[in-house]
């Protein structure tokens, strides 16, 4: 395992770490019940009744799991 020869300064450490950036998630615009909804692609979504109780999960128009 490599061992640094000298201690890295706080400013150099923070400058190196500042390059680690989170990527924004890709969102897909869909229309559900007349409303525009943004969701992540290739994910199952939870179908709820009018009261907001989760019923099941759906993917590509098919029921894939019970909640």
Swiss-Prot record:
One of its GO terms (cellular component) is large ribosomal subunit. Belongs to the bacterial ribosomal protein bL32 family. It comes from the Bacteria. GO terms for molecular function: structural constituent of ribosome. NCBIfam families: rpmF_bact. The gene is rpmF. GO terms for biological process: translation. This is Large ribosomal subunit protein bL32. Residues 1-19 have a biased composition (Basic residues). The lineage of its organism: Bacteria, Bacillati, Actinomycetota, Actinomycetes, Micrococcales. Keywords: Ribonucleoprotein, Ribosomal protein. Pfam families: Ribosomal_L32p. Residues 1-21 are annotated as: Disordered. InterPro entries: Ribosomal_bL32 (IPR002677), Ribosomal_zn-bd (IPR011332).
